[in-house]
Structure formats: structure tokens, C-alpha cells
């Protein structure tokens, strides 16, 4: 059958008429470990539900509850005086001395993200448990569990509402239970009939800490009694629990006590609001709010390869943990699991990133432990950026809004870091770690390795997310008022941080330089971290300059100094193994399979590494890295392989991401067949290990990148369909993906060929569509949707 392009007035396509399979995580037993619990969240308030039949533990979080207070902007005002000595040591090739001197250019580590509290719902009934079931319905953002005790059915439902700022729980059946609130942070609990109130503060001096108030109210048709710190419900057929919380956090630069928000008044208003509607009315508002975002994207990767027993309606459905286990151990590469993981990533971002100026952190929103791994902070040398990779392409641009204010806070503090640590009076910079207080100084506390501590490219990398938002949305006012000032500020710092290369006059390099968390081995055998002219630094700066210059052109601004500096940047080089060099010299990595691949930023998430020879070298770098790494790095590598148009490799890495990983500290024979290392936990959380949410988001973005890629240059958009789609994805469809230039794309495929496609434009423009080895240019008016038949 000959291929042809038909532009028609069709109102729908076969692809868009098809249904996505129900997206439901399902289990037949309660959670024992955090990595089995089910998350709900409204972007600020979150919960991890274990679903026990005896003591149902529910961990609560508020994304604004952190230790600490605003940073001291004048800290280490003389640290920059060490920079000349470090440069001198480097250019004399005395790397050991440079490493040791770097310790003087370190400041304090970040603050900690902390858990809010723990809710206990204890079933006071006795008797045998049968027919247990626990689900998270991603399509409708609700957790349900049910069981029979002595033949009597008990059901429980849980959701977190963004429009009404609450968590709601409904218990039905033979309800006799005790309800208690406690916390790992300093707190006190008071009870009155039908209500619990818990007040407390983050760990630390109460006069210097963020305070909170959690209020819980109960409506029931049964009897209630109150003790000192708990409530008891008896003889009930239904009980509804509402939980609200507010903190004194009032902004990155406001003292949480002296200038704190009026959290007590706010939480009282939140609780009063719960009296105005029923559980079902609250849920209807929650569902409408959630589905307005979630329903934008539907996906089917292989409609003819679905095992009926994998779907929620199946009588003998395989549980999600078994589905995950069979995927790797049983060789059953279920496309349903791949779709479920994709949509779970979208669910997590919608549920964790809706608080002004407070983006999702390493834990997203969900942290049951008092001291989260890596402080639960913002790690800006990959992890925070990766959190937002799916935001635009997977049609959730609003979820990236918390980054805008957060980056503005980094810029405000970062101009002091630029002056204090680097003697640069223009622009701003940010380092490896940050927290809710927008900390920007290099970390390490003058005693930790420079490989992660001494790095000042965080802001320069992070602001490219703002440019991505403009490319996808074409919101010129956003570019003018938000993105460009922050991008230009980061670029101004970089312009002044670059120095002329004494080894090659006329070139510009950075010194000192590190490649995030990686280490080199010199040709003389020295094992170190500090260098000059590191490829990652220059890749970030190159991407930033290209994007800032492009943004300036859109706004009618000239950046001649930046253009000249861009042309002088030390170029990429290729090493003795055919790989892209990560270091100025052709040195080997100390660990060839290191988890970071920061020198490949220009390939993904950047867009400037387009030269075929350099792409081949990047491919060789990935081959050397291999396929065994952390969860978040696996997510990154899916995208890198997809950018190289290598579907087999991209899919192989996606399969690796779905390796079943046993929970931390798990015991028992059932866990012996589960794996260790990077992959996916039973509840589909990403395993670094431990849990880091960025791997989930990297995986979701990776599926998008395999299905569709787009570029925008000088106002001309190009969209490529199925650039790296897996061969296993025989026949499917996707709707609602977004492309650079302001386009929304739906299409279906069969046997690697696009069958039908539609494109909708947010603004008037011309787009080049690449599909089935063909190229076609289409002109669209603002709001216009074109349906395209490709067979």
C-alpha cells in the first residue's frame, strides 16, 4: 500500500477512539515495608498507606516541613581568595594540591526534609482475615483496600485533594477502631470528641524552626470517645476522617518563627471547610481537578499483547508485585506493566509538585523516616532536573511551576554565593545541593570530597528547564518576565567564571572544575576529582549560552558577548577508546561504569550535541558505561539511547529499570528471588537504591522520547514520530504528547509504522513532521487541529 498524506476534516482518529487499559496497582496483602506502601498526595500534603488489617499505619508528609531557617548570605565571604591558588596548582598539574585546597571553598550542607506525622487506625475487631485487596487507581487518584473479618466486609478509601487541601479517608463496614496521631519530630497531641490536634516543629531549636499544626476530624454514624491523644469509634457502619495541615513556612527568605505564616488560623479555616461537603462531593472535586491534567495523555504500547489476567477486571489478576517479578525473572515483558509505570510517573508528579516555590524533592513528597537519604534535599547535579523531564512532553506543564519561584530564590541567594565563593559580582550561581531555603553555596563543610561538594553549575543547568517550558508552551510573556531574566543571570555568572585556557590561548575553560561525583585517573596514576576544562561544565555552559541567545532573539535582545564566548569554548574531544572525553585530557574514569554521565548533557536533556561524530563517541561512552547502574541513572540512559535513535538499547535499559528490587531491610524467603541494585520496588517506586523519585520521572520521560522527539530552531519546529520505539511495541497509540513549538500530538502505529496522526497548534506556525521515512511540512493556525493519514 502506497504511503500518502491526507489532510482532512476528520473529527477523530482510530487511535483516539481506542481506550487505554485501566491503570491500577493491585496487591493481595498489606504493606510491611515503605517500598510496598501506596502514595497519595495533593502536591503539598501526602500520605503513604500501608493498609494493615490490625494497625493501619499511614505516614503523613507536608512538602514545606524542613529543618533550618533562611541562609546566612554573608557566610564565607572570603572563600574566593582560595581560587587563584587552586588555579595555580591546576595549571602546574598539581592535582593533589588542588583537591586539598578545594576544601577551603566549601560551606555548610543542606537542611533536612522531615516527616509530618503518623496516623494509626487500629481495628478493634477480632477474627480471621480473608479476601484482602489493596489498590491504587492511577486513573482516579484513589487508594482502596478491603478485607473480610469473620465474614464481614470492611472497606477503606483514601485520597488527597488539591482544591480542598485535605486528605480524606472513608471506612465502611463493621467499624470499631482507635485513631491516633503521633510524630517523630517534637510534637504534642490534644483530643476532643471527634477531633485530634497535633502541633509541633521540625527538629531543632523551636525558636528557629518551622512549626506545624495537623488537625483531624471524624464524622460517623457510630459512637465516639476521646482519650488523652486518641479517638475511639464503635458501633459504626461508616466513619469519615479528614486531615488538614499547615506550616509556618512563609518563603525561602522569611524566618519561620519571626516572619512565619499564620498556620494556626490557616489550618482552622481548612478544617472548617470540611464541614461544608460530603465525602463524595470532596472526591468529585478532587477527581475533576486531577483528571483535568492526568487525562491529557493516554497510551497503549501493544494492544494485542495484553494478558487478560493483568487487567483489573480479571478474576485471577496477577498482582502488581508479581507482574513486576515475572517481567524480569519470568521473561514476561508485559507491555501493560510498561504502560502502568509510565502513567505512575505522571501520577507521582501531579501528586507531588503543586506547591508554589517548593518543587518535588529527592523523595518527591513521601518520606516516612526522620532522616531521609541524602537529607531528602534538592540535588541539582541531575536529580532535580530529572524530576521535571516529563513535565512538558507528557502534558503537565503546570507541574513545573513550583520551579519558577524556587529558581528565583536560588538566583537571589546565588548572587551572594557568586561573590563570596568566586569573587564574581554579576549574575548568580548554585551548587550541588539545595533545600527549601534556596541554599546555593558549595557544600562539604570544608571536609568532604570535591567530587560532589565543589561544583557551581547547578543554576546554569537548572534554568534550561525554564527555556524548555517556553519551547513547549510558546508563552512569550513567561519567557520575558520569568525565564529570560533567570537564564541571563546564570549566563552572566558563567561568562565571568570562564577563563582563557593557558594551554591553548584563545579558548575558554573553567577552572577549577569537577564532573559531578565522578573521579579520574591521570596518565601518571593520580586518582582525583579537581581539574580544569571539564567537559560537563562546558556542556552546561554551551547549552545555556545557546538557549539564552535564542531566548534573547525571541525578545529582541542582543547577546554579542555571549555569542563570542560560545565560539571560544574548548571543544569536545574523543578519547582513546572512541568515547567522548569527560576530562580535558584523555584520562580514564576511575570507575568506567560510574552512574553519572554528565559529559553527555548536550545530548540529553540538552539538544546541542548533534554532530554525527560526537554522537558516535557519546554512544561509545554509553556502551562502556554498561547497563547496571542506579535507578535514576537508568532513567537518564533510556533518554540518551533514545536521542541516539537506538530503539533496541533504549528498550533494554527501560527493561532494566523494571528490575524487581527487594525493599530495604526486607527479611523472609519470599524476598530471595527479588534483586538488589537499581530498578523498581514492589510499589513501583524507583530504587536507587534507596528510593529516589527521579528514576520514576526519568522512565516516564524516556518512554516519551522513544515515541516522539521534537526540536525548535529559529521558530521552525520538527517532530519525529517513533524515533526509537521498541520492536516489542507492535501496535499501539498515544494521545496528548506535547512537542516543542507548542504542538499537541496524537498518533497510532502498527509494525513500526505510523498509521494515523493529529497535530494541534497552540499558536500559528509551521512544523515539519518526520514519519515512516518521510518528511512533510504543515502550516497550522492557532488552535487548529490537523488530522493526518499516513498509509
List the model feature ranges, each with a label.
Residues 1-20:
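Bacterial Sec-dependent N-terminal signal peptides
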Residues 106-124, 693-740, 744-745:
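Catalytic cores of secreted or luminal carbohydrate-active enzymes
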Residues 469, 476-497, 542, 641-657:
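Extended amphipathic alpha-helical segments enriched in small hydrophobics
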Residues 43, 471-474, 499-502, 553, ...:
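Hydrophobic alpha-helix feature that most strongly marks membrane-spanning transmembrane helices
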Residues 364, 368-369, 508-512, 518, ...:
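C-terminal catalytic domain of Rieske-type non-heme iron oxygenases
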Residues 382-392, 456-467, 536-546, 598-607, ...:
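Well-ordered alpha-helical segments within folded domains of soluble proteins
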